[in-house]
Amino acid sequence: MTSGKQAAINAALADVGNSYATGWNQPGECLVSVRRWLAAGGINFGYGDPNSGYVASGATQVSWSNVQPGDVVQYESAYSPDSWIGGVHTVLVTGVSGGSVQIVEANNPGGSGYVSSNSNWSPAPPAGFRAVVWRFPG
């Protein structure tokens, strides 16, 4: 793992237990939180929609079977991947061990702005959504 991804993971883990304001582009939103954690590692996650923002940042899609610490999992609409609609969610993978995936996420439950971790996580997107794993350079 690169030092940048380790720094991003460390920033996310240090944020667990904090709560932030929510609303469009507020620090408690899941995507804004993941962007903040990646930036702590010097990883650029530019602005855009749920799909195009990753592509514009140089991230590439990888399969769930290849997920690694530092990857980002994005729930996106299966019908309109670049739409900001209810059900979109973003998490940072902080560890993978023996088939178990650890993540840090913000704003779950929605509207809470709460940052939490989960040590045995697997994607469970809502109906009509899919989970996409993105790997950033750096």
Regions found by a protein language model. Name each.
Residues S80-G86:
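Active-site loop architecture of trypsin-fold serine endopeptidases
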Residues A59, G86-G87:
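Long, domain-scale functional regions
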Residues T2-S80:
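Secreted/periplasmic proteins that engage bacterial cell-wall peptidoglycan
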Residues S65-N66, W84, V96:
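Generic structural signal for beta-strand residues in well-ordered domains
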Residues S3, Y20, G87-G138:
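Aromatic- and glycine-rich peptidoglycan recognition patches
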